[in-house]
Amino acid sequence: MLIFKRSDQLPKKATQIFIPIIDGQVVAGQYDKDFEIDLQEQLAFFAPADKPIKAGEIFEIPISMPDHSCNRISMVSLGKAEPSELRLAGAAIGRKLRGKSELVFVAVNLKSTQTKALLISANLGNFQWSLKRDQKPSESQLYIPTDDGVISAAQVISDAVNRARELIHTPSNIKNPEWIAKQAKRLANGTKVEVLSGSALKEFGGLRAVGGSSPNPGPRFIKMTYSPRTPGAKHVVLVGKGITYDTGGISLKRPYDIMAPMK
Protein backbone atom coordinates (compact mmCIF):
# COMPACT_ATOMS: atom_id res chain seq x y z
CA MET A 1 0.00 0.00 0.00
CA LEU A 2 1.01 3.63 -0.39
CA ILE A 3 1.08 6.13 2.46
CA PHE A 4 0.77 9.70 1.18
CA LYS A 5 2.67 12.53 2.82
CA ARG A 6 3.29 16.16 1.98
CA SER A 7 6.73 17.54 1.14
CA ASP A 8 7.66 20.60 -0.88
CA GLN A 9 11.33 19.61 -0.84
CA LEU A 10 12.98 16.63 -2.48
CA PRO A 11 13.72 14.24 0.45
CA LYS A 12 17.39 13.28 0.58
CA LYS A 13 16.43 9.75 1.63
CA ALA A 14 14.10 9.24 -1.34
CA THR A 15 14.88 5.96 -3.11
CA GLN A 16 12.55 6.59 -6.06
CA ILE A 17 11.77 9.87 -7.83
CA PHE A 18 9.00 10.36 -10.38
CA ILE A 19 9.13 13.33 -12.76
CA PRO A 20 6.04 14.08 -14.89
CA ILE A 21 5.96 14.36 -18.66
CA ILE A 22 3.05 16.47 -19.91
CA ASP A 23 2.34 16.68 -23.62
CA GLY A 24 5.83 15.39 -24.42
CA GLN A 25 7.65 17.86 -22.17
CA VAL A 26 9.47 17.00 -18.95
CA VAL A 27 7.99 19.18 -16.20
CA ALA A 28 10.44 19.13 -13.30
CA GLY A 29 9.65 22.69 -12.21
CA GLN A 30 11.64 23.92 -9.24
CA TYR A 31 13.24 20.49 -8.84
CA ASP A 32 15.09 20.73 -12.15
CA LYS A 33 18.06 22.30 -10.36
CA ASP A 34 18.43 19.21 -8.16
CA PHE A 35 19.53 17.12 -11.13
CA GLU A 36 22.81 17.51 -13.01
CA ILE A 37 21.44 16.20 -16.29
CA ASP A 38 19.14 17.51 -19.01
CA LEU A 39 15.98 15.47 -18.50
CA GLN A 40 14.42 16.58 -21.79
CA GLU A 41 17.52 15.41 -23.62
CA GLN A 42 17.33 12.08 -21.84
CA LEU A 43 13.67 11.73 -22.80
CA ALA A 44 14.53 12.36 -26.47
CA PHE A 45 16.80 9.32 -26.34
CA PHE A 46 13.96 7.05 -25.19
CA ALA A 47 11.12 8.71 -27.07
CA PRO A 48 11.96 10.50 -30.34
CA ALA A 49 9.83 13.51 -31.27
CA ASP A 50 8.02 11.56 -34.00
CA LYS A 51 6.94 8.88 -31.52
CA PRO A 52 3.94 9.90 -29.37
CA ILE A 53 4.23 9.10 -25.68
CA LYS A 54 1.19 7.40 -24.17
CA ALA A 55 -0.11 8.24 -20.71
CA GLY A 56 1.28 5.79 -18.17
CA GLU A 57 4.56 5.14 -19.99
CA ILE A 58 7.59 5.29 -17.69
CA PHE A 59 11.19 5.93 -18.70
CA GLU A 60 13.83 5.17 -16.08
CA ILE A 61 17.28 6.75 -16.19
CA PRO A 62 20.26 6.35 -13.83
CA ILE A 63 21.52 9.43 -12.00
CA SER A 64 24.23 10.38 -9.55
CA MET A 65 23.18 12.59 -6.65
CA PRO A 66 25.89 12.59 -3.94
CA ASP A 67 23.64 14.16 -1.30
CA HIS A 68 20.66 11.89 -2.01
CA SER A 69 19.92 8.17 -1.67
CA CYS A 70 18.24 7.93 -5.07
CA ASN A 71 20.23 6.55 -8.01
CA ARG A 72 17.51 6.63 -10.65
CA ILE A 73 14.70 8.85 -11.90
CA SER A 74 11.46 7.61 -13.42
CA MET A 75 9.88 9.99 -15.91
CA VAL A 76 6.18 9.18 -16.15
CA SER A 77 3.89 10.44 -18.90
CA LEU A 78 0.66 12.13 -17.83
CA GLY A 79 -0.40 12.58 -21.45
CA LYS A 80 -2.13 15.96 -21.61
CA ALA A 81 -3.08 15.60 -17.92
CA GLU A 82 -6.70 14.76 -18.75
CA PRO A 83 -8.60 12.86 -16.00
CA SER A 84 -8.41 9.48 -17.73
CA GLU A 85 -4.72 9.99 -18.50
CA LEU A 86 -3.94 10.92 -14.90
CA ARG A 87 -5.58 7.69 -13.79
CA LEU A 88 -3.42 5.70 -16.21
CA ALA A 89 -0.27 7.46 -15.01
CA GLY A 90 -1.15 7.01 -11.34
CA ALA A 91 -1.86 3.31 -11.84
CA ALA A 92 1.51 2.91 -13.61
CA ILE A 93 3.29 4.50 -10.63
CA GLY A 94 1.43 2.21 -8.23
CA ARG A 95 2.26 -0.93 -10.22
CA LYS A 96 5.93 0.03 -10.38
CA LEU A 97 6.01 0.26 -6.58
CA ARG A 98 3.97 -2.90 -6.01
CA GLY A 99 5.59 -5.33 -3.60
CA LYS A 100 8.27 -2.81 -2.63
CA SER A 101 8.96 -0.66 0.40
CA GLU A 102 10.37 2.62 -0.82
CA LEU A 103 10.51 6.29 0.05
CA VAL A 104 9.08 7.98 -3.03
CA PHE A 105 8.89 11.57 -4.22
CA VAL A 106 6.53 12.60 -7.02
CA ALA A 107 7.53 16.02 -8.34
CA VAL A 108 4.23 17.23 -9.77
CA ASN A 109 2.70 20.68 -9.83
CA LEU A 110 -0.92 20.09 -10.73
CA LYS A 111 -4.34 21.35 -9.71
CA SER A 112 -5.76 19.80 -6.55
CA THR A 113 -8.31 17.69 -8.43
CA GLN A 114 -5.63 16.40 -10.79
CA THR A 115 -3.26 15.52 -7.96
CA LYS A 116 -6.03 13.70 -6.09
CA ALA A 117 -6.88 11.61 -9.17
CA LEU A 118 -3.21 10.73 -9.63
CA LEU A 119 -2.78 9.67 -5.99
CA ILE A 120 -5.97 7.63 -5.80
CA SER A 121 -5.03 5.73 -8.95
CA ALA A 122 -1.51 5.13 -7.64
CA ASN A 123 -2.78 3.42 -4.50
CA LEU A 124 -5.33 1.41 -6.47
CA GLY A 125 -2.61 0.32 -8.90
CA ASN A 126 -0.40 -0.68 -5.99
CA PHE A 127 -3.05 -3.02 -4.58
CA GLN A 128 -2.02 -6.64 -4.09
CA TRP A 129 -4.18 -9.34 -2.55
CA SER A 130 -2.89 -12.49 -0.90
CA LEU A 131 -4.47 -15.40 0.94
CA LYS A 132 -1.54 -15.34 3.35
CA ARG A 133 -3.22 -13.36 6.12
CA ASP A 134 -0.07 -13.31 8.26
CA GLN A 135 1.97 -11.74 5.47
CA LYS A 136 2.46 -8.04 6.12
CA PRO A 137 1.79 -6.05 2.93
CA SER A 138 4.56 -3.93 1.48
CA GLU A 139 4.32 -0.24 2.28
CA SER A 140 5.88 2.73 0.50
CA GLN A 141 5.91 6.33 1.69
CA LEU A 142 4.95 8.65 -1.17
CA TYR A 143 5.81 12.33 -0.72
CA ILE A 144 4.27 14.95 -2.97
CA PRO A 145 4.01 18.76 -2.99
CA THR A 146 0.30 19.40 -2.50
CA ASP A 147 -2.27 20.45 0.10
CA ASP A 148 -2.88 18.33 3.20
CA GLY A 149 -6.57 18.15 2.30
CA VAL A 150 -5.77 16.54 -1.06
CA ILE A 151 -3.51 13.98 0.61
CA SER A 152 -6.11 13.15 3.27
CA ALA A 153 -8.95 12.74 0.76
CA ALA A 154 -6.88 10.61 -1.63
CA GLN A 155 -5.72 8.37 1.22
CA VAL A 156 -9.20 7.81 2.63
CA ILE A 157 -10.84 7.12 -0.74
CA SER A 158 -8.16 4.79 -2.10
CA ASP A 159 -7.77 2.88 1.18
CA ALA A 160 -11.54 2.36 1.37
CA VAL A 161 -11.65 1.00 -2.20
CA ASN A 162 -8.75 -1.35 -1.51
CA ARG A 163 -10.40 -2.61 1.67
CA ALA A 164 -13.55 -3.36 -0.31
CA ARG A 165 -11.42 -5.24 -2.84
CA GLU A 166 -9.90 -7.31 -0.03
CA LEU A 167 -13.38 -8.26 1.17
CA ILE A 168 -14.49 -9.15 -2.36
CA HIS A 169 -11.42 -11.26 -3.13
CA THR A 170 -11.59 -13.25 0.11
CA PRO A 171 -13.20 -16.64 -0.73
CA SER A 172 -16.45 -17.60 0.96
CA ASN A 173 -14.95 -20.59 2.79
CA ILE A 174 -13.10 -17.95 4.84
CA LYS A 175 -15.65 -15.15 4.58
CA ASN A 176 -18.37 -16.63 6.78
CA PRO A 177 -20.74 -14.45 8.88
CA GLU A 178 -18.49 -14.56 11.94
CA TRP A 179 -15.50 -13.41 9.85
CA ILE A 180 -17.51 -10.57 8.29
CA ALA A 181 -18.59 -9.39 11.76
CA LYS A 182 -14.95 -9.30 12.87
CA GLN A 183 -14.01 -7.26 9.80
CA ALA A 184 -16.78 -4.77 10.56
CA LYS A 185 -15.34 -4.22 14.03
CA ARG A 186 -11.80 -3.97 12.67
CA LEU A 187 -12.50 -1.55 9.84
CA ALA A 188 -15.25 0.69 11.22
CA ASN A 189 -13.07 3.19 13.03
CA GLY A 190 -15.18 5.87 14.73
CA THR A 191 -18.34 3.83 14.33
CA LYS A 192 -20.25 1.89 16.98
CA VAL A 193 -20.62 -1.76 15.93
CA GLU A 194 -23.21 -4.09 17.44
CA VAL A 195 -23.29 -7.75 16.37
CA LEU A 196 -26.40 -9.87 17.02
CA SER A 197 -26.16 -13.66 16.99
CA GLY A 198 -27.70 -16.75 18.57
CA SER A 199 -30.81 -16.09 20.67
CA ALA A 200 -30.67 -12.38 19.81
CA LEU A 201 -31.83 -13.38 16.31
CA LYS A 202 -34.94 -15.17 17.55
CA GLU A 203 -37.29 -12.87 15.63
CA PHE A 204 -35.14 -12.83 12.47
CA GLY A 205 -36.82 -15.80 10.80
CA GLY A 206 -35.55 -15.23 7.28
CA LEU A 207 -31.98 -14.68 8.39
CA ARG A 208 -31.99 -17.79 10.57
CA ALA A 209 -33.61 -19.90 7.84
CA VAL A 210 -30.92 -19.03 5.31
CA GLY A 211 -27.96 -19.36 7.66
CA GLY A 212 -29.18 -22.04 10.04
CA SER A 213 -27.94 -25.02 8.02
CA SER A 214 -24.40 -23.71 7.66
CA PRO A 215 -21.65 -25.87 9.24
CA ASN A 216 -20.00 -22.63 10.34
CA PRO A 217 -21.17 -20.58 13.34
CA GLY A 218 -24.63 -19.24 12.61
CA PRO A 219 -25.72 -15.98 10.97
CA ARG A 220 -24.88 -12.52 12.22
CA PHE A 221 -26.79 -9.24 12.10
CA ILE A 222 -24.39 -6.31 12.11
CA LYS A 223 -25.57 -2.87 13.14
CA MET A 224 -23.12 -0.01 12.59
CA THR A 225 -23.97 3.42 13.98
CA TYR A 226 -22.19 6.66 13.19
CA SER A 227 -23.10 9.68 15.31
CA PRO A 228 -22.01 12.93 13.63
CA ARG A 229 -20.69 15.75 15.76
CA THR A 230 -23.20 18.16 14.26
CA PRO A 231 -26.47 17.97 16.25
CA GLY A 232 -29.70 17.69 14.33
CA ALA A 233 -28.13 16.04 11.30
CA LYS A 234 -30.48 14.08 9.06
CA HIS A 235 -30.71 10.35 9.87
CA VAL A 236 -29.58 8.06 7.06
CA VAL A 237 -30.07 4.28 7.13
CA LEU A 238 -28.15 1.99 4.77
CA VAL A 239 -29.24 -1.65 4.57
CA GLY A 240 -26.97 -4.26 3.02
CA LYS A 241 -27.00 -8.03 2.64
CA GLY A 242 -23.95 -10.27 2.80
CA ILE A 243 -24.44 -13.97 2.17
CA THR A 244 -21.88 -16.76 1.94
CA TYR A 245 -23.02 -18.14 -1.39
CA ASP A 246 -26.05 -20.41 -1.22
CA THR A 247 -26.02 -23.14 -3.89
CA GLY A 248 -29.53 -24.31 -3.04
CA GLY A 249 -31.80 -24.29 -6.08
CA ILE A 250 -29.06 -23.21 -8.45
CA SER A 251 -30.73 -25.17 -11.24
CA LEU A 252 -33.78 -22.93 -10.82
CA LYS A 253 -31.88 -19.65 -10.89
CA ARG A 254 -31.37 -17.78 -14.10
CA PRO A 255 -29.30 -16.95 -16.02
CA TYR A 256 -27.44 -20.16 -15.13
CA ASP A 257 -24.22 -19.23 -16.98
CA ILE A 258 -23.85 -16.24 -14.63
CA MET A 259 -24.93 -18.03 -11.44
CA ALA A 260 -22.55 -21.02 -11.76
CA PRO A 261 -19.27 -19.04 -11.52
CA MET A 262 -20.53 -17.40 -8.31
CA LYS A 263 -19.99 -20.72 -6.51
Where on the chain are the PLM-derived regions?
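Short amphipathic alpha-helical segment within the helicase RecA-like ATPase core
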Residues: 1-242, 247, 255
